[in-house]
Amino acid sequence: MTAPLFESTITSLPLINKGKVRDIYAVDADKLLIVTTDRLSAFDVILPDPIPRKGEVLQAVANFWFDKLGHIVPNQLTGIDPETVVAENEREQVRGRAVVVKRLKPLPIEAVVRGYVIGSGWKDYQETGAICGIALPAGLKMAAKLPSPIFTPATKAAVGDHDENVSFATAQANCAADLAEALAGTGKNGAGLADEARIAAIRLYEEASAYARGRGIIIADTKFEFGIDAAGTLHLIDEALTPDSSRFWPADHYQEGSNPPSYDKQYVRDYLETLDWGKVAPGPKLPADVIARTSAKYIEAYEKLTGKTL
């Protein structure tokens, strides 16, 4: 097994951005190299310890969904082998954890779809009887399945900041303002693309949820990101239905009224909640057993979803 990768050092390509988990490099004017590291963030803080094989799992899960759901909306994939765009001595850094993608203009929103009342949605529902302003039936319990999935967009926060839930009208306005220049001459507008993203996100969630349920996994909620090409065509970008962007529950542990265990970083979040820590950088170091348990959770999620071994 290769050593965990906390940070990539690809010097043969220009570095464009380092996110919470992904390092992005320019391949050329039309393509990017995205390297999924083993970094883990919790409460919007990057923790100092990498989680072994986490990056491999995230990329493998995303690739699985991109392939499975490609008929719903185009995606960012180019089909180019990442090892062919870096220097020979850098191939180990991209093997199994990187992807070459189209350069696309991102929509300025996180496309969140919720199928169950949990997390911040549960808190919101308890206080208001709604989630992000969307009224729901009275009397729902924690982890209850919603009558139908709901779309609750959020702003995209910079590294270290928190995403903020916004109304769909605000999401449309943000897209209209941010995409106006990119859409000039295409006959499309940002508000319309926000609606396209909403429809696509719900379809993606519904189809993925049905598949995962057959594999013994409940997808409680998830977050998508979308971008557009020069013609204004919507594409699914970033990651898709991974343990980082979604809440996966084992179906055999699901019980309405309680918070099920998750195949994701919730184990780390639960540990961090036991600490006297202000949830600001720098994050605390993780014990070896928490790191090992979290790595195993990620690998288990991939294998249970796909029926394959990593």
Swiss-Prot record:
Biological processes annotated in GO: 'de novo' IMP biosynthetic process
Assigned keywords, A-Z: ATP-binding, Ligase, Nucleotide-binding, Purine biosynthesis
Family affiliation: Belongs to the SAICAR synthetase family.
Database matches in NCBIfam families: PRK13961.1, purC
GO MF annotation: an example: phosphoribosylaminoimidazolesuccinocarboxamide synthase activity
Organism name: Dechloromonas aromatica (strain RCB)
CDD domains: SAICAR_synt_Sc (cd01414)
Protein name as it appears in the record: Phosphoribosylaminoimidazole-succinocarboxamide synthase
E.C. numbers: 6.3.2.6
Substrates-to-products reaction catalysed: 5-amino-1-(5-phospho-D-ribosyl)imidazole-4-carboxylate + L-aspartate + ATP = (2S)-2-[5-amino-1-(5-phospho-beta-D-ribosyl)imidazole-4-carboxamido]succinate + ADP + phosphate + 2 H(+)
PROSITE patterns: SAICAR_SYNTHETASE_1, SAICAR_SYNTHETASE_2
SUPFAM superfamilies membership: SAICAR synthase-like (SSF56104)
GO cellular component, one term: cytoplasm
Name of the top EC class for this enzyme: ligase
Pathway: Purine metabolism; IMP biosynthesis via de novo pathway; 5-amino-1-(5-phospho-D-ribosyl)imidazole-4-carboxamide from 5-amino-1-(5-phospho-D-ribosyl)imidazole-4-carboxylate: step 1/2
Pfam families: SAICAR_synt
